[in-house]
Amino acid sequence: MLKELIGGLDRSTGTSEAESLYNKQIALESRYAGRGFADGIAEAQENIRKGKGGRLRPAERMIALWFGEMESVVRQAVKIAKSDPDKVSAHYAPGLALVVGTSPKIATATAMMTMISRVMRDPSGSSYTSCATEIGNLLQAEAEVIAMRKLLRQRTKRCREAGDLAGIRRASRTRKKVNEFGDRHLIHKAAANMTAAEGMILETRGKIERTRAGAWLIELVKQTCIIVKQDKTEVDAFRVAKEPGVKKRRLVLYAHPDMLAHLDKGIKARAAIRPRCPIMVVQPPSWADTQAGGYLVIRKGIVANAGPMHKAELARHDMSRTYAGIDAMNRPAYRMNGRILDTFKHLWCDEQSCPVLPPQEDPIAPTFPHADIVPKDKYYRWKRSEEGATWLKSVEGSRWRMLWRGHISKVRELKADRKGMVMLMSAAKDAGTSAFWIPNRLQCQGRQQPMTQHLNGHATDLAEAMLLFDRPVEPGEDGREFMALQLANAWGLDGWDKRPLAQRVRFVDEHRQMIEAVARDPLKNREWMMGDKKTRWQFLAACMAWHDPEMARHAPSSVDCSCNGLQHSAAMSRDENLGRLVNLMDTGRRENVHGDAAALLLKRVQADAARGDKWGTQMVGQVDSNLCKQPVMTHTYGVTHRGRVEQFAGKLEDRGWTSPSGGPSPEAYWASSYLAKMMPDVMNDLGRSAMDMMLWQQESVKRIIRQTNQPIGWLTPIIGFPVVIEKLQEKTRQIRTCEHRLSMFVPVEDMVIDCDATVTAIAAMHTHSLDGTHNMLNAMECARRDIDYRSKHDQFTTHSGRMREAKKIFAEQFVELHKSDLRLDLANQWTERYKVDLPPLPERGTLDLNAVLTSPYFAS
């Protein structure tokens, strides 16, 4: 195999050097695969140790095989017990009422999950009595949950009859809390409080009754669950026997060794198929199959998280153009930016706090007011006491809980960021000083996705700044201009990245002293840390490249498309007004669709403020281009009202509208809801044709799903990549008990398409598929012209010395993509595939697509 790889892929090095590189790559992939396997096994063992082994996927699959028959057995046993209790063994009779009081589905899931979890934790045998008691305790908790839900229904009915809206909302919030309970002690306390408030007494079963109920279910499981050995003989999966060598009679629950071996094998197999992916020290092998490409040893699918329906479509269609596009993306070789790496190491290792890196110490936790009288190890017991529960419901207690939750959330984020930094350092160590490659594959809608996790152009600002092209290209005078644009775009403050190109080029002249000082000593001259927080490291890398001629030959320069989703929508519908706003034509200046949307929104807000509207008055000084950016960009993706509210609230949070626990304040959400209601009308004023096309897609999807119950799919233009939207009402059947969550896969033939979710996703998925197609066309044409190229959605990157030529390619491929009527092509595909009458296509605009070829701000 190694000789075949060397002979088939190596082009520039000697055989011995190539063999050394391939051996290094195989060792690297094996190490990463082993690391991923070890992490998967450790995670599974931790779940088993906690008694949650039944939640692991191999255990769930085994339960799914038995569940249907076992549920029928329990249902029949309960039916007999109700009609003729004398037929139930006297030993189990005390627990009869507890099993009858819960549904057979819940009782079955509780018994099977508990038994499998216990035998996985104790393979040599688990206490029978303890297991039965645990099952009985969980059944008692389920009975209490049922009682609380019944009381809440009665309370809601009384409030509805009395017209008490506040009471209805309180009951709804309480119902949500009840559904989220995961601790039987909390359930018991809540049920006791609720029944006491209603003047009732909570009915609870004694320990003997609970144990007998659990024992009855264990007996039913023993009689029902069998496994088939290799010699085709059937044996019981569980057995109960007296513990050997003990004088006192003690029963033990055992699992069949073949069953435990099967579970262990499943856990190891699941851990083995999720390896981590390293960089490549040799050029990635070409994709030749949907499951083989990108790596020498590691096997990953060409589409991330493809479902069964999508995999079937991939197998049915010609993927040769798709393979060629991904191979073109995998073509560029990189090297580490040593100066950026050294700066990072110094700041990370020698400084505790730095604005461009996550702090290495957790923030100080909020002080617990009763810490002097409640020891830390007694807090959870005190919290359940009457005194603790009363204090936590008070204003002071509620505020402290909000602060504590915000602190925990912040600590988790910081831990994830620190882990990312460590993994990035590890990847940089693997890269060393030699050339390396970054393999890519596709997301389900056809967008590019790097297979390496931390060191790639889609990861953090720091990771992107660490990447240099391995091949040198002289920038020349033309390239120096694009390097100046890179500096202005990465600085980002004072609107430099939004100014006309001629002004952005002058950024270097106005900031030359700062650029040279930062490039000479970034640790002493830290002005670069004050730039746009999203691109600080890239600005530092651009300063170093401007100052160092050798680095300039390898440094990347990037251009961004102007709201690329709207560009595709405007081109597809030939909407001239929207095309002008997103720079599909040369108007003599850089158009700003976010600014135009903000101006229209501000007019509406000012009109409301003039009428004395509360939120209109508060929002007059807040509406600007930055506030409207996300809602405008995502409108053609089918963003919902709730999504717009979250987007506006996030921006207001950055402006000081925060709650004590972190996150947007309630006032920020009210103001955001006020603004979000106006955005659809604002976007319709900007470009009606593109909005009509989105509505046509949504209406067509509704008709198709309601008439055929088939997933929505199409082939992307030119490339022919099959896209499938697998939005299902139930991919798995969820059975929720107070302690367990059991997931069982629904057979493909029984799957029901989720119409609402698909309608919401169609606009975004179709636009992203066009975005991914444009990216692959760019990559293939750049490869044909020997230009190193990488992309991050609508951000295109290459050497500064080749950027002028590459920009022309980006515009040409965009025109080539939209040359035909993509609306008609989509309608024809759907009509032919689903045999459904679709609504008529909306009227097309008059945009001249060739204007893109002369627009300087199409990608800038």
Q: What are these language model-derived features?
A:
Residues M1-V632, G638-H766, E781-Y789, R804-K808, ...:
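Non-catalytic nucleic-acid-binding interfaces of large nucleic-acid enzymes and RNP effectors
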Residues M765, S769-H774, N778, I787-R802:
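C-terminal, well-structured subdomains that either form a transmembrane helix-short loop-helix hairpin
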